[in-house]
From Swiss-Prot:
PROSITE patterns: HD. It catalyses: dGTP + H2O = 2'-deoxyguanosine + triphosphate + H(+). Homotetramer. The gene is dgt. This is Deoxyguanosinetriphosphate triphosphohydrolase.
Amino acid sequence: MASIDFRNKINWHRRYRSPQGVKTEHEILRIFESDRGRIINSPAIRRLQQKTQVFPLERNAAVRTRLTHSMEVQQVGRYIAKEILSRLKEQDRLEEYGLDALTGPFESIVEMACLMHDIGNPPFGHFGEAAINDWFRQRLHPEDAESQPLTHDRCVVSSLRLQEGEENLNDIRRKVRQDICHFEGNAQGIRLVHTLMRMNLTWAQVGGILKYTRPAWWRGPVPDSHRYLMKKPGYYLSEEKYIARLRKELQLAPYSRFPLTWIMEAADDISYCVADLEDAVEKRIFSVEQLYHHLYHAWCHHEKDSLFELVVGNAWEKSRANTLSRSTEDQFFMYLRVNTLNKLVPYAAQRFIDNLPQIFAGTFNQALLEDASGFSRLLELYKNVAVEHVFSHPDVEQLELQGYRVISGLLDIYQPLLSLSLNDFRELVEKERLKRFPIESRLFQKLSTRHRLAYVEVVSKLPTDSAEYPVLEYYYRCRLIQDYISGMTDLYAWDEYRRLMAVEQ
């Protein structure tokens, strides 16, 4: 296996206007500080204030949004990164791994990847994703492109429907239909950073948020060697060339992951498991005492000095013993969080170090906190209790169903733009208003300028005399609608749906 040298991975160059020449340690750190400023000041980060973590449209500011969750993930990611670097320093391996002058960038990349990890999520979280994918599947039927005779293709879009004697074009149609019907928050995050926001981040910083390595247009089984890394779509056809360049710049083999992404993933796993339970108590779904009993009974096998007793039991006893300065709820979650971090962060750091050859190569086919250890079992305990007692709560399920309906309804409302012929839509884009299409003109005007410009830029580069042009134009038109609706906050999507459905003025 090739030697481990992080100087080959922490690539501080950019896609555009990249700094030139050999850089000192301080100059390289300044480049990543520039990344930090671009990310923190981006509208995509600000919109996380009004996007769902667990409870959509929540007015209680104590309950987490995507932004507060991401800030917590950022802190845990920094903690894990520092723990890794500290242990490598104790072992005199920083210089061996090319990290002696890159500890600052190492930490910064992890922190900002953690802060950005949810920026591509649509309104209403996973139910928003499901609504987008279900809506497009009902119209494009990507499964028909694989298993049905051409005459049985139910795709309602003529330019994407399979045709006899057009094998090469049909392959592109299959690819496009599959891609459009696999909207995914992580893939949308890559699209936001590169295509829509044009943030021009360093290659290493973008590599940190490429969580999954499967293209959205992938058809068929994934290789066992990359089953975990490819379990979800990680990028779209629209970013294919950019990802190819990213892989080259970061020396990543096909379908492999950037090393620091494992740290971001572990930080997210640790953060949301405790946070979801705390938010449920804040929402009065259950009390702290009820939560403790849920956790206790779900653990099953209890022994003195077990991990459960050291983490959960200890938090419960301390919160009951000290009620002078804080509420029992505050005390319990403070101790639970501290105990959880003190156990899981060192374990995640050591797992990173122990598996560094595979992680550096990008082929470690599991999460850091996904193994047969008690630490993994503790995380699963938190997740299972949340699934059984939080996500299945009637109030949560009702809000999720409402969110699904809002996103589906908005797609119904903007559907006329997808029904226009290629020539009519091209004319509408050029003139912005057409008298013969009053509804479509008004809908087009409502689209974000940023999203419209992204569509115009990419379509203007397509050869209009090519047989692929109608297929690819429609693909980017679908991306335009998905970009706009997925970029809404929960509250904006809710209000926009009610306004356009004439529920309120």
